[in-house]
C-alpha cells in the first residue's frame, strides 16, 4: 500500500524551492548570454552558446545532487528501502488472523440454539453490507491492498454453508463498492436498497431456499474524522464546516467534511437527530421485511464502534446476534467457522453496548467545540488544514465514570434502571456450552492478593471460558470517587472438553486496589474497608466473590511509594483540570444533570490563555521557563574512538554513553532529533545506521515502498478475545514480519480509550477499559520486542477523538481520570512489557501540547514509571503548535518529520537546550542500538541504492559534460581556423 501525504508533498516543494530558484537564475543568465552572443562571429557565438548550455547542464547536475543529498535525502532513503515478507510467514499470519477472529467474535444472543448453523445448511444473507463488509478502518490502521481479502460470504462458504446467490447478486448489482471514509473527506452513505426493490418473487425464492435468514449491519470508521452524531445534518450538508484554505479556496474542513447520497435511498434514510450508530430508516425497514418473512433470524453487527442494539428485543424472530468488528485480511474464515460450529465462540465485549447512546454521560461533551475569544492564538501556519487554525476544546466531564464504570455504579446508586440502559454489558459473551466458576479463598502477604478460580465445562461441547476479576471498593459519600466495578485482571482458559476443569491462579498487587486522590493527598490512597473481589461473567453479573479487608488507610506518598513506581506518583496535572464540573457519585450522582450538560461557555479564561502554548506563544519567554540557568555547555566533536555498536547492551546510566555523545556535533544532534518520519536517521560520526519505522496498528506497512504485511483484525476485535496469549502472538507475528521487511520500529500498538462510541479510530484501540487495553497492548509489545522490534505505544495521551485533533485541542480532565482511565494502558505497557518507544499525540492536555508536556513525558513517564527510551511526536505537520524547541525541552526526542519544516529543529541553542538535545539523542540511540538493527546479521547494510544510482548518474553526467566540452573546443578551433582562412 503506497500512500502519499499531501503535507509531505507541499513541504518538499517548500524545501527545494531555493534550489530551484538558484537553477532558474543560472538558466536565465545562460539564456541571456546566449542571446547577447547572437551578433558575434560564428565561432565565438557557437562557443559561448555551447559553454552556456554546458553551464545549464552542470548547474542542473549540481542542483540535483544538492537536493538529493540535502532536503530529499531522507525521503529517498525511505522510498529505496528493501525487504519483503516470505510466503511462509504471511501464511502463518493469515491463520493467526483467523484465530483472533474466531476467538473474538461475541455470541450475544442464541435463543433456541439457532447457532451454530450446521455445515451443509443453506442460509439467506440479507443486507447490502453482506457483500461489502468491514475489514478494518482507514488511515494508519488500514489494510494493505496487496493482499486479497476473504469476504463474509466466502467465509461462510468455506465453512460448508451455502448462501442465496440471488440475494448477493442483487446487492452487488445495486452497489459494488463501499463509500470511502477518509481523512480529507468522508462519504457516510449506507447504500441499503429500498425494501420496495425486493420483489415478491425474490422473497418467495428466499423462503423456498431456507427458513433461516442472516442480516448484516456494518459501520466503518477511520482516522481523521469521528462518526457523525447528527446524520440529518450530514444529509442536508450542514455537517460540513467550510473553511478558506491557503490558496483562498473554499473547501470542507477535514474533520467535518462528511457527505451522504440520500438520493440512492429516495431521500428518506434518516430522521432529524438520528446518529450513525443506530439503524437507518432503510435498515429498519429491512429488519421489518426479514422478520415478517422468517421466524429464524440471525443479526450480525460488523463494526468496531458499539452500536445501539436495543431494537433487537422488539423482534422475537431474531434469535441470534453476533458482534464482529473488522476481521482483517482473512478473518471471515474464522467467522464462518463460528457460525458453522467448527469453533465455539469465546469472545467477550470490550465495550458496553448502551440502549441509547444519546443518554450516555459523555454525549454533550464530545464533538466540535471552538473557543470564541482566543483569536490571538490563531495560527495562519496551519495551511494544510485551515480547520486547525483556531483553538478548540473537549471536557472529560464524566471523570472516571467511563463505560461500564458509569453504568454499574449508576445502577448501584439508583440513578438508572440497568436493564433499560444496557443491552450488552462490558465483558459479556455467550458460548455453545456452559461453564461454572468457583473462587478459592484469598491469601495475602500485605503486598499482593493470591487466589485461584476453577472453571468447569458443564455443557456438552468443548469450549473456552474467560475469567474476569473485578473489584468493588468501599466508598465514602463525598470522598474519593470510586466505581463499583473495576476490572483487575482476566484470563482465558484452554479449550475444555465437557466435564473438564481448569484452575487459574491470580496474583493481584494490593496497590491495584488503590484510587487516586487528587483533591486531598495528591497521590494514590488505599482506603480502609472491605474490598469485594469477584469473578464475573461480565461487569454486571457476579459468579463468585470474596472479601479482602484493609484495616487502615494506606497513603502512597513520597515516603511510601507504590512498589511498581520508580518514584511516588503525585499530582502533576492540576493545570489540566480546568474550570468544569466533574461527575460525582456523591449523593447518588446528585450533580449528574449539571456535570453532563453541554459546555455553558466557549471562552478561554485569561489564566488559561496566559499559559496556552503554540509555535507563536512559545517564544523566548517560554524557553526561559524551561531553561536550566546552571546548565553547562556540551562537548562536541570529541575523538573517543567509540561507535554506537560498542554500546549495545551497555546500561543506560553507564559513563560510556557520555563518551559517545561527546563525539557528536550539533548538526549530528539536529539530524538525529529532527528527521524521525518513518525512520531514525543515520549519523556517520558515531556509526549509527538508519533504521526503518512503519505503520500501523493492524499491520506493518512501508508507506514509501508499498511493501507491507497481512492485515490483522481491528484492535477492538483483538480486545474482544480477552486472550493475552493471542495478543502476544499478534505482536510476535508483527515482529517477525517487520524483521523480514528490515523494519526496526512499529508504529503500534495504539491503546487510547473508547471514551465514546463515536471516535473514528476506535477500531485501532482495544476497549473502553484501561486494564483490558493495557494487558492486550503490553503483550503485543512484548511479542514484537522478542524480534528486536521497538514498538511505539501510542497515542500518548488522551487522544480519544479525531475531531479537531490538530486544532490545538485542549483536553480538560481531572487527574484521577487521567491516571486511572487514560494513562493506565501506557503505564502497564511500560511496567509490564518494558516498552522503549512512545508516540505522543496531537492534542493538548489542558493548555499544553502533549508532545511538549513535561509533566507527562518527564515526570510521569520517565520519573514515576521508569521509562527508558525515546518519545516521538505524532505526524509533525505544519499545524501551528508543534515545535522541536518546546518538545525537546520537555521530553519529546524525535520529530515525526520526513522532509523538514520550520519547526523540526532546535532554533535557540543555549546550554540548557543543547543538554536537552543530547539527552534526546541518547534516548533514541539507546533504543536503536538494543534493537534488531544492531544484531550482527543486520549490520553493514551497505550504501543505499539511490546513492549508488546517483553516483552512477554523476559519472555519466561528468563524462557527458567532458565529452561535450571537448567537442565544443574542437569545433571552436575548427571554426576559428575557417574564419581566419577567409
Predicted regions and their residues:
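Short beta-strand elements
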Residues: 541-561
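Glycoside hydrolase catalytic-domain context in secreted enzymes
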Residues: 1-518, 524-539, 561-982
Amino acid at each position: 500500500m503506497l500512500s502519499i501525504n499531501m503535507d509531505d508533498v507541499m513541504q518538499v516543494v517548500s524545501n527545494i524551492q531555493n534550489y530551484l530558484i538558484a537553477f532558474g537564475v543560472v538558466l536565465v543568465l545562460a539564456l541571456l548570454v546566449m542571446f547577447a552572443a547572437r551578433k558575434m562571429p560564428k565561432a565565438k557565438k557557437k562557443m559561448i552558446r555551447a559553454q552556456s548550455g554546458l553551464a545549464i547542464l552542470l548547474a542542473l547536475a549540481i542542483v540535483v545532487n544538492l537536493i538529493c543529498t540535502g532536503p530529499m535525502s531522507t525521503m529517498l532513503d525511505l522510498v529505496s528501502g528493501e525487504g519483503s515478507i516470505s510466503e511462509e510467514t504471511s501464511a502463518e499470519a493469515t491463520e493467526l488472523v483467523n484465530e483472533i477472529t474466531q476467538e473474538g467474535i461475541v455470541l450475544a444472543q442464541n435463543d433456541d440454539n439457532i447457532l451454530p448453523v450446521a455445515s451443509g445448511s443453506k442460509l439467506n444473507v440479507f443486507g447490502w453490507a453482506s457483500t461489502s463488509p468491514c475489514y478494518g478502518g482507514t488511515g494508519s490502521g488500514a489494510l494493505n491492498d496487496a493482499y486479497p481479502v476473504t469476504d463474509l460470504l466466502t467465509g461462510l462458504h468455506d465453512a460448508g454453508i451455502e448462501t442465496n446467490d440471488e440475494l448477493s447478486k442483487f446487492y452487488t448489482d445495486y452497489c459494488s463498492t463501499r463509500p470511502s471514509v477518509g481523512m480529507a473527506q468522508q462519504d457516510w452513505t449506507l447504500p441499503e436498497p429500498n425494501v420496495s426493490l425486493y420483489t415478491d418473487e425474490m422473497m418467495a425464492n428466499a423462503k423456498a431456499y431456507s427458513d433461516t435468514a442472516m442480516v448484516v449491519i456494518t459501520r466503518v470508521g477511520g482516522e481523521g474524522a469521528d462518526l457523525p452524531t447528527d446524520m440529518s445534518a450530514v444529509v442536508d450538508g450542514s455537517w460540513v464546516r467550510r473553511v478558506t484554505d491557503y490558496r483562498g479556496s473554499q473547501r470542507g474542513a477535514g474533520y467535518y467534511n462528511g457527505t451522504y447520497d440520500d438520493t440512492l435511498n429516495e431521500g428518506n434514510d434518516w430522521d432529524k437527530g438520528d446518529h450513525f450508530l443506530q439503524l437507518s430508516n432503510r435498515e429498519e425497514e429491512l429488519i421489518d421485511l426479514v422478520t415478517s418473512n422468517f421466524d429464524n433470524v440471525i443479526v450480525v453487527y460488523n463494526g468496531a464502534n458499539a452500536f445501539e442494539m436495543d431494537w433487537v428485543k422488539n423482534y422475537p424472530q431474531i434469535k441470534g446476534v453476533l458482534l464482529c468488528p473488522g476481521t482483517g485480511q482473512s478473518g471471515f474464515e474464522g467467522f464462518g467457522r463460528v457460525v458453522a460450529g467448527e469453533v465455539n465462540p469465546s469472545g467477550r465485549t470490550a465495550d458496553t453496548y448502551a440502549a441509547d447512546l444519546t443518554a450516555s454521560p459523555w454525549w454533550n461533551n464530545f464533538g466540535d467545540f471552538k473557543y470564541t475569544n482566543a483569536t490571538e492564538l490563531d495560527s495562519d501556519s496551519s495551511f494544510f488544514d485551515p480547520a486547525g487554525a483556531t483553538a478548540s476544546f473537549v471536557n472529560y466531564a464524566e471523570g472516571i465514570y467511563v463505560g461500564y464504570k458509569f453504568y454499574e455504579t449508576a445502577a448501584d446508586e439508583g440513578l438508572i434502571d440497568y436493564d433499560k440502559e444496557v443491552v450488552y454489558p462490558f465483558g459479556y459473551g455467550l458460548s455453545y456450552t456452559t461453564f461454572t466458576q468457583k473462587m478459592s479463598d484469598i491469601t495475602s502477604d500485605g503486598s499482593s492478593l493470591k487466589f485461584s478460580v476453577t472453571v468447569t465445562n458443564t455443557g456438552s461441547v468443548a469450549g473456552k471460558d474467560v475469567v474476569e476479576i473485578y473489584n468493588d471498593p468501599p466508598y465514602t459519600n463525598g470522598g474519593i470517587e470510586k466505581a463499583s466495578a473495576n476490572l483487575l485482571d482476566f484470563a482465558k482458559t484452554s479449550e475444555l472438553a465437557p466435564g473438564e476443569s481448569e484452575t487459574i491462579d491470580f496474583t493481584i498487587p494490593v496497590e491495584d486496589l488503590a484510587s487516586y486522590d487528587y483533591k486531598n493527598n495528591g497521590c494514590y490512597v488505599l482506603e480502609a474497608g472491605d474490598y469485594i473481589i469477584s469473578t464475573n461473567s461480565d461487569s454486571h453479573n457476579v459468579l463468585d466473590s470474596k472479601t479482602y479487608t484493609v484495616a487502615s488507610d494506606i497513603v502512597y506518598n513520597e515516603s511510601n511509594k507504590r512498589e511498581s513506581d520508580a518514584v511516588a506518583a503525585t499530582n502533576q496535572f492540576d493545570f489540566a483540570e480546568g474550570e468544569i464540573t466533574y461527575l460525582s457519585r456523591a449523593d447518588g450522582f446528585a450533580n449528574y444533570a449539571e456535570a453532563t450538560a453541554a459546555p455553558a461557555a466557549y471562552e478561554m479564561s485569561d489564566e488559561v490563555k496566559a499559559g496556552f502554548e503554540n509555535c507563536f506563544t512559545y517564544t523566548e519567554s517560554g524557553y526561559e521557563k524551561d531553561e536550566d540557568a546552571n546548565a553547562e555547555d556540551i562537548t562536541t566533536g570529541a575523538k573517543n574512538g567509540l561507535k554506537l555498536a560498542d554500546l549495545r547492551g551497555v546500561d543506560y546510566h553507564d559513563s560510556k554513553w557520555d563518551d559517545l555523545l561527546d563525539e557528536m556535533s550539533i548538526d549530528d544532534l539536529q539530524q538525529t532529533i529532527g528527521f524521525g518520519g518513518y525512520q531514525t536517521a543515520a549519523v556517520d560520526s558515531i556509526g549509527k545506521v538508519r533504521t526503518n519505522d512503519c505503520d500501523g496498528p493492524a499491520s506493518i506497512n512501508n508507506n514509501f515502498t508499498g511493501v507491507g504485511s497481512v492485515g490483522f483484525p481491528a484492535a477492538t476485535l483483538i480486545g474482544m478475545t480477552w486472550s493475552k496469549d493471542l495478543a502476544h502472538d499478534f505482536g510476535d507475528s508483527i515482529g517477525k514480519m517487520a524483521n523480514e521487511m528490515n523494519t526496526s520500529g512499529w508504529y503500534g500498538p495504539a491503546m487510547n480509550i473508547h471514551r465514546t462510541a463515536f471516535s473514528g479510530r476506535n477500531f485501532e484501540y482495544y476497549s473502553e477499559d484501561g486494564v483490558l487495553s493495557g494487558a492486550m497492548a503490553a503483550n503485543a509489545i512484548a511479542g514484537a520486542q522478542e524480534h528486536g522490534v521497538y514498538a511505539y505505544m501510542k497515542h500518548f495521551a488522551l487522544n480519544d477523538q479525531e475531531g479537531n485533533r490538530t486544532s490545538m485541542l485542549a483536553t480538560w480532565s481531572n487527574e484521577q481520570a487521567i491516571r486511572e482511565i487514560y494513562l493506565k494502558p501506557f503505564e502497564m505497557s511500560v511496567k509490564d512489557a518494558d516498552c522503549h518507544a512512545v508516540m505522543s499525540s496531537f492534542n493538548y492536555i489542558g493548555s499544553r501540547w502533549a508532545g511538549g508536556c513535561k509533566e507527562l513525558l518527564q515526570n510521569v513517564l520517565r520519573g514515576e514509571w521508569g521509562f527508558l527510551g525515546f518519545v516521538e511526536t505524532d505526524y509533525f505537520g505544519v499545524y501551528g503548535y508543534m515545535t522541536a524547541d518546546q518538545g525537546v525541552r520537555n521530553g519529546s526526542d524525535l520529530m515525526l518529520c520526513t522532509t523538514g519544516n520550520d519547526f523540526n529543529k532546535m532554533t535557540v541553542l543555549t546550554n540548557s537546550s543543547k543538554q536537552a538535545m543530547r539527552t534526546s539523542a541518547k534516548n533514541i540511540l539507546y533504543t536503536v542500538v538494543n534493537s534488531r538493527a544492531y544484531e550482527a546479521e543486520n549490520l553493514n547494510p551497505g550504501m543505499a541504492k539511490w546513492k549508488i544510482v546517483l553516483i552512477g548518474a554523476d559519472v555519466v553526467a561528468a563524462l557527458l559534460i567532458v565529452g561535450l566540452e571537448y567537442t565544443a573546443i574542437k569545433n571552436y578551433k575548427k571554426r576559428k581556423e575557417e574564419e581566419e582562412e577567409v
